[in-house]
Amino acid sequence: MKNWYVLYVKSRHEFVANNELMKKEVETFLPALKSLRQWKDRKRWVEFPLFPGYLFVNIHPQPESIVSVLRTRGAITLLSAQPGHPSPVPNEEISSLQLLLDSGRDLDIYPELKEGTRVRVKRGPLQGAEGTLEKKHDQYIFLINIELLGRSIGVKMYADDIEAN
């Protein structure tokens, strides 16, 4: 019997891994939201994963199936409570998530990240720097005010690169 599992993938490889798994005829579920992004010369709707770094796969809990998934480009590991034993996700949770996305409601993916919140940079060239969240540009991009060397610098950062202090 097939079960749903959470597949952890490389940063910003959610859609790559999803497409590769679909080529292998593995049933996947990549919850994503659309957001209108604006560049200097154009606007475009862009899809962003609801859970950055993760997607769901529906496979048999047999070693061959697990190895096939893990050999997919961008895949890192299946989440597990015990090493070597991936933890299944109940079908009801997947169904609820699908219903929530199909409802068309606006979802706040990072409710803990509000304007004025103190944040710390988790990765990238500014790793370890602390600042204040000034503005939310869209679901995933925030303007952070960081004080470095006596100066205040505004930096746009992806939400998965920062955390609330």
Predicted regions located by residue number:
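Ferredoxin-like alpha/beta domains used as RNA- or RNAP-binding modules
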Residues: M1-N165
